[in-house]
Amino acid sequence: SASNEWIKYSLILSYNTQTESTTYHIVSFKNANDVLNTTLNFNEKYLINNVNKVDDFLFFTDNYNPPRKINVTKQYQYPTTIAGEDDSTVYNDILVIKSPPTKSPSIQNLNTNVQDTFMEERFICFAYRYKYEDDEFSATSQWTSPSFIPKPFNLSIENYLNEGMVNNTNTAIITYNSGPSIVTGIEILFKEANSNIIKIIEEINKTQNGVVNDTDYEYTFTDSKIFTILSEGEILRLYDNVPLLANSQTLMGNRIMYGNYVEGYDLKDVNGNT
């Protein structure tokens, strides 16, 4: 960090020895009385001793901030001003952890005049996940209850079965949230209640579809089509296990490993006491 009487700057930069050019990847600042501390939030008492480069990603941790990374091919936005306004670089943009949707989508079950019977004998649950820059994906949201409303009881004399036990719903209206500005896309997902296979219903590009940030949208699901299947491991990916703080970091088997770390939050009562 370099400092003057009023502002302390924190930088992440790279120098190209061949072109003798400097790239400022991130510029952030802290004002003189330490009230404002933007994006990088470096502290001279907590040195960055652990750095790993994986492809175009530079991972680092200082045991003062959560584990973070940057794309070394990218220049992040500069602060808007040095007069005390927030840094225009979103703090969450450089976190290793990518936040998933905070809750499951909501669904409205309908019986419409569509002829497709895909949902008739299926217990279908819905979820969604966020896509971030650099093709990173969050964990999935929580899953909804099955979209199933039985038809009236109808006992068959021939086989003594309740033939009314089929889905009276053939359409589900799924309401999801578009997420913050660093979310570039949304994938709407479904799975059958008795299966671990997750399928993608729709991939929504926020820019191409004019999707507004942090806004609820609806998607109407009616029929069967050719779905993309997610890898089997996604059903077990309930969350991304990135620590709150980590004192050490290394690369092992193409995985980032953290050591001497802090994870989890203290449980608090209604009064905010731990």
What positions do the PLM features span?
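Disordered, low-complexity "stalk" and linker segments at domain junctions of extracellular
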Residues: 1-274
